[in-house]
């Protein structure tokens, strides 16, 4: 059944295109004006310290931020579109056929979950691999083995988290039309929420706290932390202490490698625990939702 759900999603070219729509928008905005804006911003920051660095290092930093935004949004949008299979089955009454058969309801639900997770991991991992290659070509150093493990591990963590959260939300939808409208809304908003269009640090403290309560923001920030921090360190090393370490401090704030919650900065460890907590919470909520839906069918 998991294989069937994966095939249904992959055969729907429209769903795949919509899965990538946010990433296409991010790339378009980046190429049109975002990249130059942030390159100019970093250059101005260095000019403020009366020092210069190589342009390729600044390009690598900004490109790494782009890649983190693409991956941070992909784990959400791919998960959301993968779960459209579940909504289609409801609308077409295929779930009634499952209920009439010997297949357990829990098996059906698990197949939707596993299919969506596999789709999300595979597509996001492909995008991450392409993103790392792009960053290296632009001048970024190739990630160390431990950093690669972190990045692909975060893709898995983000995929599981996104599917669990969106699966709970999707359980309240019965028609493709309403789910498609919700899908469009989230696809547009997620780029702002995780700081893919504009770094979250540009928002007020209140807005930062609001968007940073969303688990996807923590996944994106951890990916950003792993990808962007080495680039910041490369630039700091090239400055040889001429900035007294201030560039790294300002750049980390500007690109939000850590998040702001209720006026307090939270680090990688907190974000990891928060993400795991969200997974456990929505696992429980999905189990409760499944029990209630099973009782209604009985």
Protein language model regions, located:
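Transmembrane alpha-helical segments of polytopic membrane transport and secretion proteins
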Residues: 1-11, 291-298
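Hydrophobic alpha-helical transmembrane segments of multi-pass membrane transport/permease proteins
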Residues: 4, 8-44, 62-78, 117-124, ...
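Hydrophobic alpha-helical transmembrane segments of multi-pass membrane transport proteins
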Residues: 25, 59-137
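Transmembrane helix segments
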Residues: 29-37, 170-231
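Perimembrane loop-to-helix junctions flanking transmembrane segments
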Residues: 41-59
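Alpha-helical transmembrane segments and their short interhelical loops
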Residues: 105, 116-194, 283
């Amino acid at each position: 059944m998991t294989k069937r759900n994966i095939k249904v999603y992959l055969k729907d070219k429209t769903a795949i295109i919509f899965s990538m729509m946010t990433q296409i928008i991010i790339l378009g905005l980046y190429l049109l004006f975002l990249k130059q804006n942030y390159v100019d911003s970093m250059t101005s920051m260095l000019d403020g310290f009366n020092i210069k660095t190589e342009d390729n290092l600044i390009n690598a930093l900004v490109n790494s931020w782009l890649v983190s935004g693409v991956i941070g949004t992909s784990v959400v949008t791919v998960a959301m579109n993968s779960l459209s299979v579940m909504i289609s089955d409801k609308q077409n009454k295929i779930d009634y056929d499952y209920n009439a058969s010997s297949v357990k309801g829990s098996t059906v639900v698990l197949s939707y979950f596993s299919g969506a997770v596999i789709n999300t991991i595979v597509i996001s991992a492909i995008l991450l691999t392409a993103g790392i290659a792009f960053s290296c070509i632009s001048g970024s150093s190739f990630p160390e083995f431990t950093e690669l493990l972190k990045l692909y591990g975060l893709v898995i963590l983000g995929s599981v988290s996104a599917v669990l959260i969106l699966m709970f939300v999707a359980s309240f939808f019965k028609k493709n039309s309403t789910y498609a409208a919700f899908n469009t809304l989230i696809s547009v908003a997620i780029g702002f929420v995780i700081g893919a269009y504009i770094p979250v640090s540009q928002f007020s403290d209140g807005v930062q706290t609001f968007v940073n309560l969303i688990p996807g923001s923590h996944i994106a920030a951890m990916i950003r932390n792993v990808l962007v921090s080495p680039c910041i360190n490369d630039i700091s090393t090239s400055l040889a202490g001429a900035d007294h370490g201030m560039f790294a401090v300002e750049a980390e704030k500007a690109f939000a490698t850590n998040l702001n919650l209720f006026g307090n900065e939270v680090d990688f460890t907190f974000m990891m625990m928060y993400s795991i907590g969200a997974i456990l919470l929505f696992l429980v909520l999905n189990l409760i939702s499944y029990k209630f839906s099973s009782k209604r069918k009985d």
